[in-house]
Amino acid sequence: MSWRLSFRTNLLIYNVRRRNYATKAAGKPATRPNRWKSVIGLEVHAQIQTNSKLFSGAEVAFSSPINSCVSLFDASIPGTLPVLNRKCVELGVRTALALGCKVNSVSMFDRKHYFYADLPAGYQITQQRAPLARGGLLSFPVFVPGVSRKPYYKSARLHQLQLEQDSGKSLHDPVERKSLVDLNRAGVPLMELVFEPDLETGEEAAALVKELILILTRLGSCSCRMEEGALRVDANISVHKENTPLGTRTEVKNIGSVRAVAQAIEFEIERQIGILDGGGKIFNETRAWDAAGRQTIAMRDKEVVQDYRFMPEPNLPPLHVNVDGECDADVVVDAVHIGSSLPELPEETRRQIVEIHNLTPEMAIILVNDITLYNHFRTILDEPGKARSPKAVANFLINELLTILNKNKIDIEECRIPSTHLAEVTDMLEGNIINAYLARLIVQEALDGEGRESPALLAQRNDWLMITDTERIEAMCKDAIKNNPKVVEKYRKGKEKMLYALAGEIAKVSEQKVDMAKSVDLLKNMLK
């Protein structure tokens, strides 16, 4: 591909992206057609990371054989009673404090009645009247690399955080016309986090979920493995025009990934706008996200409000939590002690990266959003006896390593290249031994070899070393000037961009190994 074609192609791509994402790039929510506004509230069910269930001693293990982790209480055998798991309460309090909630000194458990085959008791034990905590605020950055030009911050109020038990799983066999029930999940401890409808776009919702995942994993209160169902998201969505009452909302249930949160919400917003613009009516219904078809599909309507017949759970006493002063921590869960041992949260880490290491907010967001990437950054930067540039390390990890991993469709968690080898590539870049193009070749070769050989050996063996010899580069510059007289003429007439066309020819001849900065300087001197 010639440099002209490449330039025109990149310009076309830029203009298309600019039209599609102009409002997001400006750091603001997208503007809807005909002044439609969307209102989004999330409910997040996070599985509490404990070894046993909320009210029984049965093991919690995702990959266990069917119905192998079921106690008598989980199966609702008459005469069995619930015993509250203290660890679940402690992790719930820990999460509430990290999110700025007010932990209630006394909370209550309730029965929520409904019938499903995988709910053998006919009710779920939850917290309706007096939850573990209320209030709270989650602030988070909204930024999509490659789409957003600039991040912006959004906040969502947390209405309440409550403890509850999960239901079992129904497995439907259409061939045999049977429904099979697995009770391994029945009684697994959950935190339900109910957010106020403060969001406007799918990207904001996805950013909230991403930030919540970062917080919960740092707290150790949830594994957040969405592929295992450890974190599930329900979205309540409505649209209305400015200065009009809120529209009828629909609920999209059990969204199973961060990207799916954005996609499902954006689809549902556009679906509702399309119906209303066509003179139709939105029904209060529950919908599901069909990832394969990339659409929401109707599950059941909610026009008739279901009566869950909430009532106090008679077999559990009020839950007392110490929220001020001293107490016997062996008897009562102590929120004061738990609050004093909270870890550094993602926003504090981002602040330090910007203020201490002088990186951009965009870089800080990308690094902190992936714990493996951030660990590589810290390991390389903190190596004893080395004084590396934080900006150089971050640039390599974000612009070179992630580019190659994305090209190979490999998650960074699966990357077998050790931090020591990544540090070596960074040093070679900083020492002008290789350039960015050669760094990518080395990373690709290291990936193919599962990181067994050092980058220095790979560079030597494949002759992937930058050409820095002045005489060699001068000879290449002379050839480029000689072979491209029309480009030279345009440059001398004032078209300065033509200089980079000549530099591109030199890069091509050298197989991208030449020191580009040096070649540009030499060309300038030769063409004076």
From Swiss-Prot:
Q: Give the quaternary structure.
A: Subunit of the heterotrimeric GatCAB amidotransferase (AdT) complex, composed of A, B and C subunits.
Q: Does Transport count among this protein's keywords?
A: no
Q: What is the lineage of its organism?
A: Eukaryota, Metazoa, Ecdysozoa, Arthropoda, Hexapoda
- Give the protein's recorded name: Glutamyl-tRNA(Gln) amidotransferase subunit B, mitochondrial
Assigned protein family? Belongs to the GatB/GatE family. GatB subfamily.
Do you know which SUPFAM superfamilies this protein is assigned to?
A: GatB/YqeY motif, Glutamine synthetase/guanido kinase
InterPro entries per the UniProt record, alphabetical: Asn/Gln-tRNA_amidoTrfase_suB/E, Asn/Gln-tRNA_Trfase_suB/E_cat, Asn/Gln_amidotransferase, Asn/Gln_tRNA_amidoTrase-B-like, GatB, GatB_Yqey_C_2, Gln_synth/guanido_kin_cat_dom
Q: Write out the function statement from the record.
A: Allows the formation of correctly charged Gln-tRNA(Gln) through the transamidation of misacylated Glu-tRNA(Gln) in the mitochondria. The reaction takes place in the presence of glutamine and ATP through an activated gamma-phospho-Glu-tRNA(Gln).
List the molecular function annotations (GO) for this entry.
ATP binding; glutaminyl-tRNA synthase (glutamine-hydrolyzing) activity
| EC number(s) from the headed UniProt entry | 6.3.5.-
Annotated catalysed reactions? L-glutamyl-tRNA(Gln) + L-glutamine + ATP + H2O = L-glutaminyl-tRNA(Gln) + L-glutamate + ADP + phosphate + H(+)
In Gene Ontology terms, what is a biological process of this protein?
A: glutaminyl-tRNAGln biosynthesis via transamidation
Organelle transit peptide = 1-21
Identify the enzyme class: ligase
